[in-house]
Amino acid sequence: MKKILDWYNWIKFNWLRKVQLVDIDYVDVSKDPVRPNLDLKFRTSYGRKIYGLKYENEIVGVICVAYTNDIPTTEKELDLMSKVSYYEKNSNTAIAYTVWSHKKGAGKKIMEEAKKFLKGKADRIVTLSPLTPMATHYHIRNGAKLINLNPTTQNFEYKL
């Protein structure tokens, strides 16, 4: 029975071997389950980036990253810190402030690919996550460590 399950899982998730992380300049922000209030201009200005997990010709996962030199606890701090770091050219921390996927397995894979991509570009990768059980479980399952519990958010850190 174990061999059958192993084979089934291999077939079911084999597509993950064929994905790549790409820099994208457009995403339908209304599909963002975490921060749909942040418009496209916010996500692509002041050095902020949108990365997509591409499988064949489809984006199956999205991660939005801002570059700062400190750890924000609110969206306002994220905005201000990323602007300051952009102008001073001194960012050392990648802040993943939203992650979502359209295909099972893509959420975990996009974080793995983002960590590989950001290694050497940032000293650390930290999240600005909502205070929800889903966000907590996602980050803990993917190997992150809770470093701050804030009034409206939480920060997790991933090892690069």
Predicted regions and their residues:
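Conserved N-terminal entry element of GNAT/NAT acetyltransferase domains
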Residues: 1-25
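Conserved GNAT-fold acetyl-CoA-binding loop/helix
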Residues: 18-38
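A short helix-loop-beta-strand connector motif used in the catalytic cores of GNAT acetyltransferases and
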Residues: 40-61, 66-73
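Conserved acyl-donor/pantetheine-binding loop and adjacent beta-alpha core of acyl/acetyltransferases
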Residues: 64-95
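Conserved GNAT acetyl-CoA-binding A-motif
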Residues: 94, 119-131
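Conserved beta-strand-loop-alpha-helix junction that forms the acyl-donor binding cleft
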Residues: 101, 126-137, 150-153
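Conserved acetyl-CoA-binding loop-helix of GNAT-fold acetyltransferases
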Residues: 101-118
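Conserved catalytic-core motifs of GNAT/GCN5-like acyltransferases
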Residues: 145-158
